[in-house]
Amino acid sequence: MLRDTYIGLVDDSFIGKHVKLAGWIDSIRDHGGVLFIDLRDKEGKLQAVLEESGNKELYDIAKHFKEESVVLVEGLVRRRPSGTENPKIKSGNVELLIERIELLNASETLPFPIDDNVDISEELRLKYRYLDLRRPKFQKAIKTRSKALKITRDFFEENGFYEIETPFLIKSTPEGARDFLVPSRLHPGKFYALPQSPQLFKQILMISGFDRYFQIARCFRDEDLRSDRQPEFTQIDFEMSFVEEQDIMEISEKLLSKLFLELLDIELSTPFKRITYKEAMERYGSDKPDTRFGLELVDLSDIFKNTNFNVFKSAIEQKGIIKAIKINKILSRKEIDNLTEYVKGLGAKGLAWGKIENGEFSSPIAKFLTEEEIKAMLSRLEAKDQDMIFFSADKPKNVYKILGNLRLQLGKMLNLIDESKFAFLWVVDFPMFEYNEEEGRLEAMHHPFTSPKTEDLDKIKYIVDKSDKEDIINIGENIGARAYDIVLNGVEIGGGSIRIHKQDIQKLVFKILNITDEEAAMKFGFLLEALKYGAPPHGGLAFGFDRLMAMMLGFDSIRDVIAFPKTQKGTCLLTGAPDVVSDKQLKELHIKIT
């Protein structure tokens, strides 16, 4: 080894010892005859001192070294002079008196300083990601990620799970997003797909009798990217046989409790709160509600069922709803206009509002409402002086979208969110299907392998043979799924379900989703075949590991907790991927670019 120990591990116990260290020059300062060189490696920093009086030749060479150059140093560890200690670092009581220094590799002038407090464009950061990763906060993030993976593996091993790798080159079975396709050289015209999840393989592992499986799974989805999306990402994936929803939830809570305790020294209160999908939508306008603050939606539909106000009347006649949010502050005209533009961006035609000043309700819509309606509305909202109310009247789906997002916007705007809090929540009792208006059909709310609730199996069998579209939609949207999502601070960090383990039920679900027998056999024939040979009841869950790490460490984007992330356009600025390939490579793959 070139070194005796790590730079950041040198402390009081090394006083009086000669050591050999290797690392980077974090900073270098010339104090006229004395060079102060802060050395750095993965464990931390250490101040080193080179005195001109001790070795002028070495001093004259070292004073020209640049920051971030790599050096090998030897010297004596001594106590720092009284009053110069640095309590912020482990080595803050000591320093290294340099007797020898060797430049292992010089650094050119950096495109940006290695400093957490400097604002750097993300484009520049990702181009020089290896420099960006030297910054303390990203060193901490990647190290914490590594520790989290170890904790996760240890946890599952202690609980009787097997870590089993599933294939990367698989059959294309789209699960919602587009697949990344890989052409086969040996089978011209045929393609592998990269897995969007290990879903089918982990179910087959349960059929194989392994009982408990887990994997730190790499997943790939060719989709439009946002701050919480990457084309390749990591999941903590697990599956269990002979279980019910409660069993999956308990193991999930235990894992999260272990991660939070060991990484953040935070003790989580379990079991986590549970809320049904219906309640989440009605109260918060979202199936992943942020429960760190109030501003719940209030239903006013019954109050305005006989109203003459055309906007509300039209909504009721079209089987819509009327809901409102109340805040304890009267906003300025400019703030109201900004919120109006915001909800218009979500598809709203406008934003109806009202306020209470000096005990009087005033609103642009007040003249269309009766005194009885206003009185009943204010009573339902428990409104008082200096309160403001925002309304939405439309189909339930649209109202929830508008008010759910408006609620979050108001929460941030009014500083109602406690950013130091971790609010966990299980959302349960999801519908099995939802209606896709564009395609005019039912689609799976989670995925087609989710088991329906036992009490709704007859509905599944009933609508398969129905031809009346409205009947199919009405019944289909009221079939419950044995699905569950885990939400943290308004972000879904994991989701799962009890799976279908009987072939006949799986075939019926495929039919409801307009997947023909031929298409099902072509895409999922291997699963249907496996379900014939004694498949046990089973279920599982997958955590979005990148997202979980970002939230635990206080980052807004998952890109900050991934060593080499892609941009929002799916490019790697470090390597230049994706890129063109040679004609020879394309020819071998029997591919022509047009």
Swiss-Prot record:
One of its GO terms (cellular component) is cytoplasm. Gene3D superfamilies: Bira Bifunctional Protein, Domain 2, GAD-like domain, Nucleic acid-binding proteins. ATP binds at residues 221-223, 230, 492, 544-547. It catalyses: tRNA(Asx) + L-aspartate + ATP = L-aspartyl-tRNA(Asx) + AMP + diphosphate. Residues 199-202 are annotated as: Aspartate. Transmembrane segments: none annotated. The keyword Electron transport does not apply. Aspartyl-tRNA synthetase with relaxed tRNA specificity since it is able to aspartylate not only its cognate tRNA(Asp) but also tRNA(Asn). Reaction proceeds in two steps: L-aspartate is first activated by ATP to form Asp-AMP and then transferred to the acceptor end of tRNA(Asp/Asn). GO terms for biological process: aspartyl-tRNA aminoacylation. The lineage of its organism: Bacteria, Pseudomonadati, Aquificota, Aquificia, Aquificales. It is found in: Cytoplasm. The gene is aspS. The record marks 31, 83 as: Important for tRNA non-discrimination. Its main location: cytoplasm. Keywords: Aminoacyl-tRNA synthetase, ATP-binding, Cytoplasm, Ligase, Nucleotide-binding, Protein biosynthesis. It comes from the Bacteria. PANTHER family: ASPARTATE--TRNA LIGASE, MITOCHONDRIAL (PTHR22594:SF5), ASPARTYL/LYSYL-TRNA SYNTHETASE (PTHR22594). This is Aspartate--tRNA(Asp/Asn) ligase. GO terms for molecular function: aspartate-tRNA ligase activity; aspartate-tRNA(Asn) ligase activity; ATP binding; nucleic acid binding. It is an enzyme of class 6 (ligase).
